[in-house]
């Protein structure tokens, strides 16, 4: 059987497994996922999509608009979130196909095949379709945008990046990475930026006409940054930034400006503390890869107030070897994940060949270090590129040892 048919068959099996996991383990109620449902129902109670005009002052903050409105559409049409879970499970399969195509175009068919193999053996790639988290649609649109741009369809690439931003507001990382990758292709990346600008401006103008606010993506960055550094500053001077969420005299845009001011005011006198937190944020982002393993928890554990408890690194260390099914999968996933990360780091010697992938990871990590807060979920959008680099290193290592 020729290679292309084998790859299609593998991707098909991978997609079917995603659907089987959804059927067998059901919905995973991550806190954010549950929050999206609440926000969607609230907006629909006003017969609108998120954010409803009447809630501009009562909303604590503006969350991931695209993800919430996907829930709203599903609830409005089907009175259920199951259709989205099925769509997300299918998107996982399409995403693998795009990862394969990007890798093939950049690095050749041999590396693409190894990338595909590493990808399907990576446990964290299973189960994402059992929740409403933003990673699945965001990664799909970003990767499809990258692929379109690699193939020379820059305008379409920009449009897809704009769609990704609607689900999670960090598509700019992938746009910047591609601009650096093709730094001399001015016409190409200008078209990419125009496509992106068209989508976000269209969404923004539609919301301005309907709701009186120019909004096209989530506004949680300054809130998270201000709260993170307040929490990790031993002095705890002034009020907690999260207290602003209860101020119903401010719109979510005004709250966002307040959080920005709070953080910048804090930064003036705490530059040392800010710099000291940078390696901690990076460590928190990459040290663990247990989030998606919650899919395999029992229903009883999923219903706990802190669902992640049994899968935390500390709990895993203390429980060994008396593990549950989910904990054994988590252990395997961690070993596999660390193997990917190690081979990715070793691929630095091939950075000239792996420029695009390394640009994505470096820019994304820089954003987390300077403008974000450390969280295990935050490395997920970069894993396809990390896996490509890992595959390239493994392929070259194998050649050298033969």
Residue ranges: model-predicted function:
Residues 98-101, 118, 137-154, 161, ...:
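Specific aromatic-rich, kink-prone transmembrane helix
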